[in-house]
Every structure is written in C-alpha cells, then in structure tokens.
Amino acid sequence: MIDYTKINSATWDLWAENGCEWSVPISHEEYADVGEANFGVYLTPCITVPHEWFGGLKGKKLLGLASGGGQQMPVFAKLGAVCTVFDYSDKQLETERMVSEREGYPIEIIKGDMMKKLPFDDESFDLIFHPVSNTYVEDVYHVWNECYRVLKRGGRLLAGFDNGLNFLFEDDEPLTVVNHLPFNPLKMPKEKLEKMTANGDGVQFSHTMEEQIGGQLKAGFMLKALYEDRDRKGGAKIGEYAPQYISTLAIK
C-alpha cells in the first residue's frame, strides 16, 4: 500500500513552489487592513465565511486544520485569536512562519498528517477552521472524530469540502461522466492511480454527504448552518452548472 498522504504532502509543496493561488500569503497591506468588521477568509473558493460563524475571536484558541499558506491564520491572529496551524506541507508551513515573523504575531506551527491522531489534548480549542482539504484523505470519519475530541464543549467547527461532482469527470470538454462515486483511486486499477499522480494531482478522494455531513453528526456535532459554493473563474467546467462545495458550521 502506498503512503498516499506523503505523496499529497509533496504535491502541495510543489504547488506552493509554483505559486498556487492557495499558497500566496496575504500582503502586509492586507494584514494591516484587517479589523473586526473588515476581514474575509475562505473555506471554499468564492464565498467568504459569514462573520457571525466565528462568534468573536479575541482570546479564543483556534486550530487551522490543513490550513497552511499564510492566508487565514494571519487574519485570525490579527483579530486576537491564539493560533495553531497544522498542515502536512513544509512549504505551506514555511509561508505561515514567514508571515508571522513579518507581522510579529505568535503562532504555533505543527507539521503532521491528519489521518493520524492529532497531537493535542482533549478539549484544547475553541474553534477549528478546516478549509477544503479532506479530498486528500481516505477516511473523513477519523477527521471529524478528532475534531470533536480536541474541541472544547460549545466549540465551533467551520469546515469546507467537495460534494463529489468534480470527480465525476476527467475532462471539461465534453462533460462526460467517467467515474463512479465515491471516487477512491486506492480501490481502482493501478493505472488510474498512476495517471493521477503522474499528472501532479496527488491522490484525491471524493466523499459522500453521509460521510461529510453525516460524519460530523455521528461524531457528536450539531449542524447550525451551511452554504454552497463553486470554483472560481477558470475552475472546473461543472461549476458553471452546479455548486461543487459546501461549507458548514457545527457546534460541539
């Protein structure tokens, strides 16, 4: 069995080196402009998270789960949160370190695989911010269970995830269904996995809504709100016809 999470770590390092849009940190000017009524962060590509989902950040212990890249954590730090970022990409974490040193705020930076037990005590955080990233893990139930464990009672989980539509198709033109869902390359012919990694896509999975939303509920969370979203311009063609992403707010 391949160590697919290490492949994905290396893939994100390469994307970051090549200037992936999710690896470009906020500028000093953008950081300076952040205020309680003036900030925007993304769980999914286009729609910024409603401010009321955060419930106030000053003094709150916040975990950015698979949230490296220097885009969200600087905002949370500027708003007074006590921040920890956890990611499996060295390059994404290097960017977090660079921005924190440039702006002079403290942050705990931890490299790790979210398919393993998170290196935190039970009930360590008030809020977890988890943007689209569980497409890179096979077992999302484990991720939701770990989120529940490390959140304090009454804590908030803000999560973004793919709804699976992106995995139905291999090419944009024409839009022809070629894959069964849920998409799991580890259970498919070896050639499909080799094609995915050779194309520089890493090893990606789709997950059902039973896994994504049902998994949060099964872990013990109470779902409070959600919204749908699409790719930005130039993204997958299917986004012109239907939303591909969901963001959820859940409470422990």
Where are these regions (language model features)?
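A short glycine-rich, Lys/Arg-flanked "PGG" loop and its adjoining helix->strand segment in the class I
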Residues: 141-156
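Core SAM-dependent methyltransferase catalytic element
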Residues: 219-221, 236-252
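Conserved alpha-helix/loop element of class I SAM-dependent methyltransferases that forms part
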Residues: 26-60
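A short acidic, Gly/Pro-enriched loop at the edge of an enzyme's catalytic core
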Residues: 115-128
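A short SAM/SAH-binding and catalytic strip from SAM-dependent methyltransferases
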Residues: 126-141
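Short alpha-helix
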Residues: 203-226
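Class I SAM-dependent methyltransferase SAM/SAH-binding core
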Residues: 55, 60-117
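Conserved class I S-adenosyl-L-methionine
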Residues: 156-190
